[in-house]
């Protein structure tokens, strides 16, 4: 992580300043969250259940508010009464419901209500505390159904007089009710597993508000349950500030309901974010000096979870602004960026999977993708909670809806729809204005954000989609197939997760080692590549100076043409082609993955403008490539001609390069797609392959390779002419002493070639050789020295 942060904070990678610092804020925040998570994996502690040495009197409280389902509260009360440890049960009924009075009377439950309804849930519990006498007080949410042995692993921990409360796992029974329920549950798995277990070591175990057992004297010491929207965390803070200790028992002793609709989930998250921010602003400073140093960090960091709403917003804005303004937040080699990001990302995933040995149940293991996506879709709720805190706006304490019904949630989707629409508009505008690789990458990020928004919207409409699928057999069949696919994937996923947990440490060590290796030996690789290039240039010089056998005599015979024993100009001599053309080989953007800053359309248009000022009227562009759109659009706008070239690698298997997916097929598809561009003046087959083959082959093998190339080239030129008979087709040859003979051979074998492009990269070949070429020719590439000594003043068109 230090290597990652050091790399991205380097001054050399800074791009457009506002976007860069926005991105750095997002990166730093994410790294801090990861560090916080890792710190809660260091001391995973499962406390042993002490032997029971005495009996405690226990009061169990649950609540009811008007509108909550009767079936739910009756089920909970019945289960509470079935708990085997002796206790008294209290229903804190805010509605003073007559039906529930009868139920309580029948079950032997104390029915408690109040007339002064203050402090929401905390006030309701405190009212019941005032009329109860138990030494221990259990708070259960009305949707959480306890098991008969609920109290057995908890009670004995209170033999330690310093323990103020004991918290157990919040587990759920409706995880599979829908994507919202599944995602909301997944967000809790790591927290109630290894993270809360580590809080045992730090002395920072939180009271969660449900399934928590308090010592009455501890509550009395702080005046009862603390009030607020996050009353559970407030109570924890007050008790810890008083010096009370807490214990987390990682045991599933009750199961409740997780929000299953978007409105219920958003209400819960808004209540928590507003409540936690309020505690951070108004309570945390007052209690700060009374916390241990671990508790100071703990309660100071928890609100940062809800600050992630701003980070998500930044992540939405960066690609949008980048696409609209045509700027980049960072100037970094994509390979280098991958080398610094991927190892850290892999370590985060592997560590998270490794600690899943300590989650509660097997179904809680996994990537928790649904939970992560749902969290991203909650960005605006977190921001709203923060804004409400600053504005002092109060929101009513409303119990999380439990019925799973939702009529119309489109208004709740408006912020996500805005992000979706804005991102789509930015993608269309940005790529239309400047189709370069970096804009495509940014469009990819914006597209990912669109997917995040679409997921949350689709998840919120899942009930409506189910109704729709039942009305249409096709959708019903697709839904059935998807369910079967998920079942099969679940089996595969279990095996993958198990393997990752087992081998996580070894994989992580391997990744770190590979990162060090690539970083250490990259300079050696560059040196080896440089030496290889020098050897290649040496071989080229040998071929040009006739010190190496180019294989031409054998090739003449293989092609069925007579061998010229002496070189002479036959016919009228060189015929100038593209006369009046002053061109440039424009190769910017070819190695775009290792080029930064990004090659933008603005830079391209400025280059073309300067070219026109110096008299250049044509560029030679190699394609097809990512910059075709920009280059062809800009050259058309500025009335610049294009000599469209195709680079032919010499290592191509020309004997087998036929059919779909072949190089020739790609070239022909490009010609068909672009032949309507009027400012493309010709098609060029680039790279003097027939001569370069002599560097790596010799003898009969060389002859076979060269003959295969000629046959391939003949088929290709024929195909191009069939698609576009009006434009000339040219082919490159290296300018050497043998060039006139080679051109004669190629022109005889492939008469459809309209002209030959001379690649002139040295000054040793006499200029007279250029004049002796008995075919139409032009200069497709020339170095500066060769231009001054051999080409300047010649008749044919020139590309430098």
Predicted regions and their residues:
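Membrane-embedded multi-pass helical conduit in multi-pass membrane proteins
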Residues: 2-28, 40-43, 50-53, 305-395, ...
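Active-site groove signature of glycoside hydrolases
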Residues: 668-706, 730-736
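Long helical/loop segments within the catalytic core of UDP-sugar-dependent glycosyltransferases
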Residues: 112-136, 148-230, 240-241, 258, ...
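The conserved acidic donor/metal-binding loop of glycosyltransferases
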Residues: 141-145, 239
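Aromatic-lined substrate-binding rim segments of carbohydrate-active enzymes
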Residues: 603-662, 707-730
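Active-site-adjacent substrate/metal-binding segments within catalytic domains
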Residues: 210, 551-638, 660, 668-669
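Extracellular glycoside hydrolase catalytic/binding regions
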Residues: 704-800
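Short, acidic, metal-binding catalytic loop of nucleotide-sugar glycosyltransferases
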Residues: 76-87
């Amino acid at each position: 992580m230090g290597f990652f942060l050091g790399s991205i904070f380097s001054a050399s990678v800074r791009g457009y300043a506002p976007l860069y610092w926005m991105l750095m804020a997002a990166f730093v925040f994410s790294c801090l969250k990861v560090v916080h998570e890792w710190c809660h994996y260091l001391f995973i502690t499962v406390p042993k259940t002490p032997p029971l040495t005495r009996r405690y009197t226990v009061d169990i409280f649950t609540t009811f508010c008007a509108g909550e389902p009767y079936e739910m509260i009756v089920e909970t009360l019945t289960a509470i009464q079935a708990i085997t440890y002796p206790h008294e049960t209290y229903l804190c009924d805010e509605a003073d419901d007559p039906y529930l009075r009868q139920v309580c009377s029948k079950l032997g439950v104390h029915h408690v209500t109040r007339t002064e309804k203050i402090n929401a849930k905390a006030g309701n519990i405190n009212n019941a505390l005032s009329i109860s006498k138990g030494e221990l007080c259990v708070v259960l949410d009305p949707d959480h159904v306890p098991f008969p042995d609920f109290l057995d692993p908890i009670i004995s921990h209170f033999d330690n007089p310093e323990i103020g409360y004991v918290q157990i796992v919040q587990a759920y029974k409706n995880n599979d009710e829908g994507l919202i329920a599944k995602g909301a549950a997944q967000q809790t798995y790591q927290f109630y597993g290894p993270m809360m277990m580590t809080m045992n070591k730090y002395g920072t175990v939180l009271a969660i508000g449900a399934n928590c057992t308090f010592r009455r004297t501890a509550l009395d010491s702080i005046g009862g349950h603390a009030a607020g929207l996050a009353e559970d965390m407030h109570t924890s803070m007050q008790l810890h500030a008083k010096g009370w200790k807490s214990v987390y028992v990682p045991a599933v002793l009750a199961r409740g309901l997780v929000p299953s609709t978007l409105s219920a989930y958003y209400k819960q998250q808004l209540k928590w974010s507003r409540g936690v921010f309020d505690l951070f602003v108004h309570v945390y400073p007052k209690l700060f000096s009374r916390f241990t140093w671990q508790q100071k960090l703990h309660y100071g960091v928890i609100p940062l979870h809800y600050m992630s709403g701003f980070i998500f917003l930044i992540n939405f804005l960066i690609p949008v602004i980048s696409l609209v303004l045509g700027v980049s937040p960072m100037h970094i080699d994509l390979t280098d960026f991958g080398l610094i990001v991927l190892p850290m990302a892999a370590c985060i995933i592997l560590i998270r999977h490794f600690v899943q040995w300590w989650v509660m149940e097997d179904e809680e293991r996994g990537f928790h993708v649904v939970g992560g996506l749902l969290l991203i879709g909650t960005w605006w709720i977190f921001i709203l909670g923060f804004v409400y805190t600053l504005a002092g706006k109060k929101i009513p304490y409303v119990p999380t809806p439990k019925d799973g019904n939702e009529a119309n949630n489109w208004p709740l989707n408006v912020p996500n729809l805005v992000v979706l629409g804005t991102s789509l508009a930015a993608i269309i505008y940005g790529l239309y204005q400047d189709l370069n690789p970096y804009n495509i990458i940014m469009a990819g990020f914006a597209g990912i954000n669109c997917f995040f928004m679409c997921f949350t919207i689709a998840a919120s409409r899942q009930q409506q989609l189910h109704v729709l699928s039942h009305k249409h057999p096709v959708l019903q069949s697709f839904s059935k197939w998807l369910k079967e696919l998920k079942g099969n994937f679940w089996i595969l996923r279990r095996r993958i997760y198990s393997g990752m947990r087992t081998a996580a440490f070894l994989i992580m060590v391997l990744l770190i080692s590979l990162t060090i290796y690539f970083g250490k030996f990259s300079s050696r690789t560059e040196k080896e590549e440089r030496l290889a290039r020098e050897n290649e240039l040496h071989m080229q010089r040998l071929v040009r100076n006739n010190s190496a056998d180019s294989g031409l005599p054998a090739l003449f015979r293989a092609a069925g043409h007579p061998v010229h024993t002496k070189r002479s100009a036959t016919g009228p001599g060189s015929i100038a082609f593209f006369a009046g053309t002053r061109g440039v080989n424009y190769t910017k953007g070819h190695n775009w993955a290792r080029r930064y800053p990004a090659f933008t359309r603005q830079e391209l248009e400025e280059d073309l403008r300067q070219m026109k000022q110096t008299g250049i009227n044509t560029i030679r562009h190699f394609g097809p490539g990512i910059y075709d759109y920009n280059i062809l659009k800009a050259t058309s706008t500025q009335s610049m001609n294009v000599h469209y070239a195709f680079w032919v690698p010499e290592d191509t298997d020309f004997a087998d390069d036929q059919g779909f997916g072949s190089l020739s097929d790609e070239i022909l598809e490009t010609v068909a797609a672009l032949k309507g561009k009027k400012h493309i003046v010709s098609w060029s087959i680039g790279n003097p392959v027939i001569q370069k083959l002599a560097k790596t082959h010799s003898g009969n093998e060389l002859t076979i390779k060269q003959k295969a190339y000629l046959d391939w080239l003949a088929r290709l030129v024929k195909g191009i002419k069939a698609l576009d008979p009006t434009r000339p087709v040219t082919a490159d040859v290296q300018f050497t002493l043998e060039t006139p003979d080679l051109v004669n051979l190629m022109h005889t074998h492939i008469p459809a070639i309209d002209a030959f492009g001379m690649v002139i990269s040295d000054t040793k070949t006499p200029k007279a050789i250029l004049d002796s070429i008995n075919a139409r020719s032009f200069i497709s590439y020339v170095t500066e020295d060769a231009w001054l000594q051999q080409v300047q003043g010649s008749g044919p068109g020139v590309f430098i």
